């Protein structure tokens, strides 16, 4: 019987937590995450590679072959197809099987990771493989002070991941890698004092963003995330739509080196071949990649909120083709609109961008107001959606989603107030599938729905100083109790009458106590 996604998730969490308990103590949670995810990745590419070599032939078991039978031609063909090569002796299953008795485990793992990476040298996949295992440091003193201690903890991680009942990755209904990541972040980030929210967009929010960006498109040339994080948004697009709809693959840029590695691992883990994704490392705003790859038919992004950037301190940026049309740069203390303008520049004429934004950018004055004016005057703003608070890790802020389009059929701007659409779960709120469906139906129809959605004329937005706050246009539901004045007056009259009677009764009692006769 197939497990449901809830059962899969619960089982995965239980197993991962068991691994955590086995190695707890010397490695703090944040560093530990890299070892579990690195081992998970190592296991996956080993099984994936074995499956490729065996090609469905039950008579072949790649893991049992001797390394010496591998010819140069076999190796060359495999690297051209898969992007890397793993010898039978280097497979996860063979290393994990001997992990508890291998005195050279940490050195062997390091050699294997170097060999896998170097197998791609000189091939088109070189950049996609390089540095993937950089955060799996087998020599780290956090694993223990002696080689014996290091090996014991590495063995515990390998044996734990070996025991994960993963089955066929493609049959799983959940984003396995992302779910492991989400689980580890939520359990460790608070204790480690580090926030994982900027690196990971929860799957329920990712689902909504992907559907917004891909809505109505029968096919897209490629999908792009300028602040890719761990790749969760790009992968949600893959999960939401048939593989063939995204023709040329997945593109993203990420500034954090560790997260950049996680994003590349994530692509492989979801069976996206090296020639179907391109994740670059670097600062999107000042060192943008993919200028030759644009435009993109679908852009999804959850960029960092209100981060500082060089802005006007770099005099060349105002002439940059991404920012020049607006005539002004985003404030140095708040780069939010710089990411928006970057995405707009990379968007195709038929495409959509769905970007998570800090709410302040929609109503503040100054440069941000001028950028809003540019976006509205050129009819790029399709929809602004306000979400419920506490949907993301690391922030309780109620954020917005900005949907940009270059192919609108009218000049109206749609506003959707989804702030009441959420389900409370432990420390965070979530969007259910029903909530997402409700938002998408309103988004698609562009119909006005009381207290939920309103399509506003261009002239109204202009008259409102280009304010794009949802609350300025969608009237919140009045949750105050409706008072019936006539009924209230009647109740008041009855109450006053009762009070008068009580006073008389009290006076009578007092008079009796004092021995006086009450006058009638």
UniProtKB/Swiss-Prot annotation:
UniProt binding sites for S-adenosyl-L-methionine: 198-203, 230-232, 254
Catalytic activity: a 2'-deoxyadenosine in DNA + S-adenosyl-L-methionine = an N(6)-methyl-2'-deoxyadenosine in DNA + S-adenosyl-L-homocysteine + H(+)
Enzyme Commission code(s) on record: 2.1.1.72
A biological process from GO: methylation
Keyword DNA-binding: yes
GO molecular function: DNA binding; N-methyltransferase activity; site-specific DNA-methyltransferase (adenine-specific) activity
Any further remark recorded for this protein: Type I restriction and modification enzymes are complex, multifunctional systems which require ATP, S-adenosyl methionine and Mg(2+) as cofactors and, in addition to their endonucleolytic and methylase activities, are potent DNA-dependent ATPases.
PANTHER family, per the entry: SITE-SPECIFIC DNA-METHYLTRANSFERASE (ADENINE-SPECIFIC), SLR6095 PROTEIN
Free-text function comment from the UniProt entry: The subtype gamma methyltransferase (M) subunit of a type I restriction enzyme. The M and S subunits together form a methyltransferase (MTase) that methylates two adenine residues of the sequence 5'-CCAN(7)ATGC-3'. In the presence of the R subunit the complex can also act as an endonuclease, binding to the same target sequence but cutting the DNA some distance from this site. Whether the DNA is cut or modified depends on the methylation state of the target sequence. When the target site is unmodified, the DNA is cut.
Subunit structure: The type I restriction/modification system is composed of three polypeptides R, M and S; the restriction enzyme has stoichiometry R(2)M(2)S(1) while the methyltransferase is M(2)S(1).
Protein name: Type I restriction enzyme EcoprrI methylase subunit
Species annotation: Escherichia coli
């Amino acid at each position: 019987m197939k497990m449901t996604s809830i059962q899969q998730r619960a089982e995965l969490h239980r197993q991962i937590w068991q691994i955590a308990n086995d190695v707890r103590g010397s490695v703090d949670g944040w560093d530990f995450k890299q070892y579990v995810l690195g081992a998970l990745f190592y296991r996956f590419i080993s099984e994936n590679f074995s499956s490729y070599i065996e090609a469905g032939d039950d008579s072949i078991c790649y893991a049992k072959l001797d390394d010496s039978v591998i010819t140069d031609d076999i190796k060359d063909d495999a690297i051209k197809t898969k992007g890397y090569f793993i010898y039978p002796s280097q497979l996860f299953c063979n290393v994990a099987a001997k992990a508890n008795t291998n005195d050279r485990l940490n050195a062997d793992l390091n050699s294997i990771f170097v060999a896998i990476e170097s197998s791609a040298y000189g091939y088109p996949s070189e950049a996609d493989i390089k540095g993937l295992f950089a955060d799996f440091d087998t020599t780290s003193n956090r694993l223990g002070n002696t080689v014996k201690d290091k090996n014991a903890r590495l063995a515990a991680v390998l044996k734990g991941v070996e025991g994960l009942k993963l089955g066929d990755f493609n049959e799983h209904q959940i984003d396995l890698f992302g779910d492991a990541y989400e689980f580890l972040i939520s359990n460790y980030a608070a204790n480690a004092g580090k926030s994982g929210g900027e690196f990971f967009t929860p799957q329920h929010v990712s689902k909504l963003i992907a559907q917004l960006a891909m809505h109505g498109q029968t096919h897209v040339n490629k999908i792009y995330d300028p602040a890719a994080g761990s790749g969760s948004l790009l992968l949600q697009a893959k999960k939401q739509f048939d593989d063939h709809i995204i023709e040329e693959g997945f593109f993203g840029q990420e500034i954090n080196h560790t997260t950049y590695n996680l994003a590349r691992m994530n692509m492989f883990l979801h069976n996206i071949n090296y020639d179907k994704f391109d994740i670059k490392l670097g600062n999107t705003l000042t060192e943008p990649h993919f200028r030759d790859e644009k435009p993109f038919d679908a852009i999804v992004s959850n960029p960092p909120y209100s981060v500082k950037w060089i802005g006007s301190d770099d005099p060349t940026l105002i002439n940059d083709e991404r920012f020049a049309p607006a005539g002004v740069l985003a404030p140095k203390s708040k780069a939010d609109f710089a990411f928006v303008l970057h995405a707009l520049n990379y968007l195709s004429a038929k495409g959509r961008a769905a970007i998570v934004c800090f709410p302040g950018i929609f109503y503040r004055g100054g440069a941000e107001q001028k950028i809003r004016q540019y976006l509205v005057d050129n009819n790029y703003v399709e929809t602004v959606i306000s979400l419920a608070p506490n949907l993301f890790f690391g922030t309780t802020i109620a954020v917005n989603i900005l949907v940009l389009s270059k192919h609108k059929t009218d000049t109206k701007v749609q506003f959707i107030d989804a702030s009441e659409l959420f389900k409370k779960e432990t420390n965070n709120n979530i969007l259910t599938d029903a909530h997402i469906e409700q938002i998408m139906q309103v988004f698609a129809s562009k119909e006005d729905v009381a207290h939920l959605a309103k399509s506003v004329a261009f002239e109204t937005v202009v008259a409102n100083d280009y304010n794009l706050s949802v609350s300025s246009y969608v009237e919140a539901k009045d949750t105050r109790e409706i008072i019936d004045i006539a009924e209230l007056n009647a109740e008041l009259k009855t109450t006053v009458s009762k009070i008068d009677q009580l006073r008389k009764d009290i006076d009578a009692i007092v008079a009796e106590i004092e021995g006086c006769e009450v006058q009638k």
